[in-house]
């Protein structure tokens, strides 16, 4: 059984990942890191987990963990990894955007592999660091994959995509209020 740690577990991404790990037969949730909620039950941030876990948030990490997921806001994974080191055998999966671009993929001896298992399975299986694609990149790649495999992409692809507000995280900002987001499209 692989032991898993989640960094930034109080947000939407962290909450969904906690739920998936708790239900996975080959994974064991060892810790969920949050400096703002340390000592509080996970269910305070994620009431949908009531009855699934009694675990609490912690401000401690296990550097020998098998897998660590970074569920931090964009731009925060680099800073976290500069302050916290993990064993060479630890698989690091960044769900933010810090390591998605090739020029950012090499970090302190690790080469972050970007991609989806459907497209880069072999490279991901060998990796000790993974940069997970964002929601739009994932949706577009999965939608176009069957066409690309059959050589049916004959011209440029143009996509129009709309996002909700959960991608912005749980923190409030001037752009996360309904009155600002309602019918607010940029062209």
Predicted regions and their residues:
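N-terminal Rossmann-like NAD(P) cofactor-binding subdomain of oxidoreductases
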Residues: 1-187
């Amino acid at each position: 059984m692989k032991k898993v740690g989640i960094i930034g577990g109080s947000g939407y991404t962290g909450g969904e990942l906690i739920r998936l790990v708790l239900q996975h037969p080959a994974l064991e949730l060892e810790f969920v890191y949050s400096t703002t909620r340390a000592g509080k039950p996970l269910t305070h941030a994620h009431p949908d987990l009531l009855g699934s876990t009694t675990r609490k948030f912690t401000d401690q990490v296990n550097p020998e963990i098998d897998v660590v997921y970074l569920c931090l806001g964009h731009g925060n994974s680099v800073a976290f990894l500069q302050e916290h080191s993990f064993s060479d055998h630890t698989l690091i999966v960044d769900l933010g955007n810090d390591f998605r671009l090739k020029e950012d993929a090499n970090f302190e001896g690790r080469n972050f592999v970007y991609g989806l298992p459907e497209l880069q399975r072999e490279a991901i299986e060998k990796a000790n660091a993974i940069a997970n694609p964002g929601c739009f990149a994932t949706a577009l790649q999965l939608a176009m994959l069957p066409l690309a495999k059959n050589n049916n992409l004959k011209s440029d692809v143009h996509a129009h995509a709309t996002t909700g507000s959960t991608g912005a995280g749980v923190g409030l900002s001037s752009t996360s209020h309904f009155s600002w987001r309602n019918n607010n499209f940029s062209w």
